[in-house]
């Protein structure tokens, strides 16, 4: 998973 700049986990 990666952490996007909005703070969401994808």
From Swiss-Prot:
Its main location: secreted. Its cofactor is Cu cation. It is found in: Secreted. GO terms for biological process: lignin catabolic process. One of its GO terms (cellular component) is extracellular region. It is an enzyme of class 1 (oxidoreductase). It catalyses: 4 hydroquinone + O2 = 4 benzosemiquinone + 2 H2O. Keywords: Copper, Lignin degradation, Metal-binding, Oxidoreductase, Secreted. Binds 4 Cu cations per monomer. Inhibited by NaN(3) and SDS. Partially inhibited by Fe(2+), Fe(3+) and Hg(2+) but not by other metal ions at a concentration of 10 mM. Optimum temperature is 60 degrees Celsius. After incubation at 80 degrees Celsius or 20 degrees Celsius for 5 minutes 50% activity remains. Activity is lost after incubation at 100 degrees Celsius for 5 minutes. After incubation at 60 degrees Celsius for 1 hour 18% activity remains. The keyword Metal-binding applies. Optimum pH is 4. Activity decreases at higher pH and is lost at pH 6. Its EC number is 1.10.3.2. GO terms for molecular function: hydroquinone:oxygen oxidoreductase activity; metal ion binding. Monomer. Lignin degradation and detoxification of lignin-derived products. In vitro, has activity towards 2,2'-azino-bis(3-ethylbenzthiazoline-6-sulfonic acid) (ABTS), catechol and hydroquinone but not towards 2,6-dimethoxy-phenol or guaiacol. Belongs to the multicopper oxidase family. This is Laccase. It comes from Lepiota magnispora. The lineage of its organism: Eukaryota, Fungi, Dikarya, Basidiomycota, Agaricomycotina.
